[in-house]
């Protein structure tokens, strides 16, 4: 199968990434990727931008180098299951990932992580949970993924985690998480987690996982731009006028 949407990418605005959004779009165009979400880190992450950065994404063109640009954010899970963007930001974004990051949420125990994930799902402020395979943030797979399925929050399959070079120990956990998502009928999304433009849309490890466990493509929201936009509608997001031509 071929993934056509990358829902987790970074620009240099994240503080530890190295490309502009124009460079990311050019790389996506060269690859033939029709759509990606730009999801820089929210402000609690060291080096990340002020929340005004996300409010002002309205100035971004909807297409750059003929690639559809979805305005997003990778928010940090903090406290007992909050996210670190003000409520006023929500209306400016098309897509929000919530993720654990050690500098913001020190690793605790499975129960604490599970409770935080369930709370953030139930807040209805996030569309996906990012890189859940990280062994530093163990959680009850069944409880969290069942809750995500109930609330139509996507579970991210993260290509960077599956490479095994960061968040060491994630690979087997990613496979197990995907199997539980398949069993419980949860939606999954796919993110390169690119911090450099040449990694945009690179999904060899994720595509292998999907093929290996025969994950149903109707639950892979990034299989086509239309499936992704249909998922946004399911989540209650307003239609994006400029993307109507992609709904075929």
Swiss-Prot record:
Pfam families, sorted: PHP, PHP_C
Cofactor: Zn(2+)
Similarity remark: Belongs to the PHP family.
GO annotation terms (biological process): bacterial-type flagellum-dependent swarming motility
GO cellular component: cytosol
EC nos: 3.1.3.-
Residues the record lists as binding Zn(2+) 3: 74, 101, 131
Organism of origin: Aliivibrio fischeri (strain MJ11)
Annotated positions binding Zn(2+) 2: 16, 41, 195
Entry protein name: Probable phosphatase VFMJ11_A0899
Gene Ontology MF term list: phosphatase activity; zinc ion binding
Manner of cofactor binding, per the entry note: Binds 3 Zn(2+) ions per subunit.
Keywords: Hydrolase, Metal-binding, Zinc
InterPro entries reported for this sequence: Phosphatase_YcdX_put, PHP_dom, PHP_phosphatase, Pol/His_phosphatase_N, Pol/histidinol_Pase-like
PANTHER family: PHOSPHATASE YCDX-RELATED
Domain of life: Bacteria
Gene3D superfamilies membership: Metal-dependent hydrolases
Enzyme class: hydrolase
Zinc as UniProt keyword: yes
């Amino acid at each position: 199968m071929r993934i056509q949407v990358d829902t987790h990418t970074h620009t240099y605005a994240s503080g530890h990434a190295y490309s502009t959004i124009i460079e990311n779009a050019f790389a996506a165009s060269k690859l033939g990727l029709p759509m990606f979400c730009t999801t820089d880190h929210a402000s609690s992450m060291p080096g990340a931008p002020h929340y005004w950065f996300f409010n002002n994404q309205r100035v971004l063109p909807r297409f750059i180098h003929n690639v559809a640009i979805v305005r997003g954010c990778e928010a940090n899970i903090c406290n007992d299951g909050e996210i670190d963007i003000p409520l006023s930001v929500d209306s400016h974004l098309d897509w929000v990932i919530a993720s654990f990051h050690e500098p913001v949420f020190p690793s605790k125990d499975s129960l604490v992580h599970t409770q935080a994930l369930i709370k953030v799902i139930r807040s209805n402020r996030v569309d996906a949970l990012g890189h859940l395979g990280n062994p530093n943030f163990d959680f009850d797979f069944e409880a969290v993924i069942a809750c995500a399925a109930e609330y139509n929050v996507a579970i991210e399959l993260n290509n960077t985690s599956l490479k095994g070079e960061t968040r060491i120990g994630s690979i087997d956990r990613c496979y197990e998480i995907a199997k539980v998502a398949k069993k419980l009928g949860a939606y999954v999304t796919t993110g390169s987690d690119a911090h450099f433009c040449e990694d945009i849309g690179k999904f060899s490890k994720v595509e292998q996982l999907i093929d290996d466990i025969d994950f149903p493509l109707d639950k892979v929201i990034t299989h086509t731009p239309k499936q992704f936009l249909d998922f946004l509608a399911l989540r209650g997001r307003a239609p994006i006028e400029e993307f109507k031509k992609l709904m075929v």
